[in-house]
């Protein structure tokens, strides 16, 4: 009957929708380097749930954030995962700035993100275990962390991005607990110099990484991002650099992630 046919059609539509539902997992990943478990949120597209290998984008939160920051900031992330067939991995980086801290041996988040977490992800999910299918990005502290990680571990990541990143920490010596990780600026200038992204560029040449960098025009990190852009130009390192109206806000990053995912998706498909 007609009603029965309509019910069947609706059932098929519901079944199709169910097949395309991304899954959000929260897991504890063991860090041998820090001797503790680290909370990580995984956004898994239907393809990965079905064991079809997918590329991976690691997303790092900002100061004061946690593993759930990105799924809260961008509720559409599961839908984006399904549309692009990308796994998103969002670790809890505390307020570490994603360094292996020279002052605090309990904070070895560079090792965790670039080694332990990548190995866990590739060992437990349907990934493409290759730098050409692996990208990393983040906001604010996480933008610094993403570029820091990728530039220093270009064998692990093929692409990297930064949204409103603190890419030169030295103009902000009293902010965001960085002195807990590096020591007081006045007494440890060499360490601060060595742990800022703009001083890592000698580790890469053009073509090593696909890079996207953006910052709001009303952001307090705008000038350090412009400086990074100019340093990359001076070294003839190709990169996308975007400034748009906006400040250091969730509204800005909710928009930024769209640009970064598009950039990474194109990189993965090369």
What is the predicted role of each segment?
Residues 12-21:
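Hydrophobic h-region of N-terminal signal peptides that target proteins for export
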Residues 21-270:
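Non-catalytic cap/lid and distal C-terminal segments of serine-dependent acyl enzymes
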Residues 1-11:
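Single conserved hydrophobic/aromatic residue that forms the stacking wall/gate
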């Amino acid at each position: 009957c007609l009603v029965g046919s309509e019910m069947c059609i609706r059932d098929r539509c519901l079944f199709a929708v169910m097949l395309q539902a991304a899954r959000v997992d929260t897991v504890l990943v063991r860090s041998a380097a820090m001797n503790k478990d680290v909370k990580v949120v995984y956004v898994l597209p239907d393809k990965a749930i079905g064991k079809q290998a997918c590329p991976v984008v690691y997303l790092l939160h900002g100061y004061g954030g946690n593993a759930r920051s990105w799924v809260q900031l961008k509720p559409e992330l599961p839908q984006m995962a399904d549309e692009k067939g990308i796994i998103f991995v969002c670790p809890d980086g505390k307020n570490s700035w994603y360094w292996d801290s020279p002052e605090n041996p309990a904070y070895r988040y560079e090792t965790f993100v670039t080694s332990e977490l990548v190995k866990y992800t590739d060992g437990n999910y349907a990934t493409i275990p290759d730098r050409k299918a692996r990208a990393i990005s983040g906001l604010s502290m996480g933008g610094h962390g993403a570029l820091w990680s990728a530039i220093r571990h270009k064998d692990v990541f093929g692409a990297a991005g930064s949204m409103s990143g603190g890419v030169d920490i030295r103009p902000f010596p009293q902010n965001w607990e960085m002195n807990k990780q590096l020591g007081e600026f006045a007494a440890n200038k060499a360490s601060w110099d060595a742990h800022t992204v703009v001083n890592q560029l000698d580790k890469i040449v053009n073509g090593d990484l696909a890079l996207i960098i953006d910052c709001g025009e009303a952001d307090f990190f705008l000038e350090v991002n412009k400086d990074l852009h100019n340093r990359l130009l001076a070294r003839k390192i190709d990169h996308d650099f975007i400034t748009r109206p906006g400040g250091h806000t969730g509204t800005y990053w909710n928009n930024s992630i769209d640009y970064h995912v598009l950039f990474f998706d194109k990189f993965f498909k090369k």
